[in-house]
Amino acid sequence: MFPNYDADNPTEEQAKIGWAGHGHSIVEVSKVGKTGELKREFGPLNRRITATTEFTLVGPAAGSDYVKTSADKTGKKVKGTLNNCSGGITPWNTMLSGEENFDQYFAHAKLDDKKAQESLERFGMEDGESQRKWERFDKRFDVSKEPNEPNRFGWIVEINPLDPKSTPVKHTALGRFKHEAGNIHIASDGTVVCYSGDDSRFCLLYTSPSPRD
């Protein structure tokens, strides 16, 4: 991506380009007659969702002490999404995507709190610098400075592509792990079910049925 890129010494500009390059593109297109081709339209729906876009955290973990940081005392506003994997379209025409392999972005993952340290290790985070060295330019990627920041990733995200002013959401009710996809299916009895796999080694496929209330 960058000529003569030095992985051990990226520049701040390169890091910021990396932040902008992560996430999702919402692109407005139109059909070209019956050719099967699509034409890009420069309409109001086009936008980027990146590693610096504000998300709203919802569900049981939202607002808990585990997701509060120095930049977000509420624990309900998350900056960005990372390493987005497969997803799907919901019956209400929004898009889901899983945050996968987010461990690679965080540095100095060694804490005195035993429970917190076990969580970091469970997700594969280690002491020392991160692969991308983003912690040099934004302290939220340094676990020794922001120990709860990793807890704000590893969720299913939901984006409304038809409302460019909408704030994307992270759903904590669907569990935190290395989400391989987040796909919706409506069962024969009308129950909405979300399917997602944990992309860690030797892990599981999860189903999350709605309570129908």
Region locations from a protein language model:
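Conserved beta-propeller blade signature
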Residues: 1, 95-96, 191-196
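Carboxylate/His-rich catalytic cores and anion/metal-binding grooves
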Residues: 12-53, 84, 88-141
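Beta-propeller blade signature
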Residues: 24-29, 152-161
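Blade-edge beta-strand/turn elements of extracellular beta-propeller
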Residues: 34-75, 157-176
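Beta-rich, blade/repeat-based domains predominating
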Residues: 78-90, 176-187
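Structural motif
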Residues: 107, 202-205
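Conserved small/polar residues in nucleotide/adenosyl-binding loops
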Residues: 206-213
